Regions:
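PLP-dependent aminotransferase-like
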Residues: 77-133
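Conserved PLP-binding active-site segment in aminotransferase class I/II-type PLP enzymes
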Residues: 1-78, 82, 103-104, 121
Length: 133
C-alpha cells in the first residue's frame, strides 16, 4: 500500500494520509459476480454481509445501505427525527449531512468549526441549542 501526506489546508498542522486502494483479483471476481446478477444495492450478497456484520459487531441485526446519505437518513429516522425538528451540523462537512436532515423533514442548523482542530465548535453547538434541536 502506497501512502502520501497531503496538506489539505495550506497553513495547517493537520496532515491527511492518502492511501491508494488495494484491489485484488479475488475482489474483482466478487464485484463482477454481483454485477452479473444485476443486483447493485440488494440481493443475496447483501444479506450475507448484513448477517456477518451483525455477528462481527455483536448486534442482533445489521442493515446494509447503498450510500452514506441513506445511512444518515435511516439513523435520523431511527432516533425519531421528524418534520419541525432541528439538527445541528458543522459548516465544514459533506453535503450528505445536511441532505439527510432535509430528507428526514428536519431543518439543518449549520454551526462553525474550531480553527484548532476543524471539528464542530462546542460553543457554536451550545449557542444553537433550543427546544427543536
Amino acid at each position: 500500500m502506497q501512502k502520501k501526506n497531503l496538506d489539505v489546508f495550506n497553513d495547517s498542522h493537520i496532515k491527511v494520509p492518502f492511501v491508494l486502494p488495494e484491489i485484488t483479483n479475488e475482489d474483482k471476481k466478487a464485484i463482477m459476480s454481483t454485477l452479473n446478477q444485476n443486483l447493485l444495492t440488494d440481493g443475496p450478497k447483501l444479506r450475507i454481509f448484513e448477517k456477518e456484520f451483525a455477528k462481527f459487531t455483536g448486534a442482533k441485526y445489521a442493515i446494509g445501505v447503498s450510500n452514506a446519505t441513506a445511512a444518515l437518513h435511516l439513523s435520523l429516522k431511527a432516533i425519531g427525527i421528524k418534520k419541525g425538528d432541528e439538527v445541528i451540523v458543522p459548516d465544514l462537512t459533506f453535503v450528505a449531512s445536511a441532505n439527510a436532515i432535509l430528507v428526514s423533514g428536519a431543518t439543518p442548523v449549520i454551526v462553525d468549526i474550531s480553527k484548532e482542530d476543524y471539528n464542530i465548535s462546542i460553543s457554536s453547538i451550545e449557542n444553537s441549542i433550543n427546544k427543536k434541536t
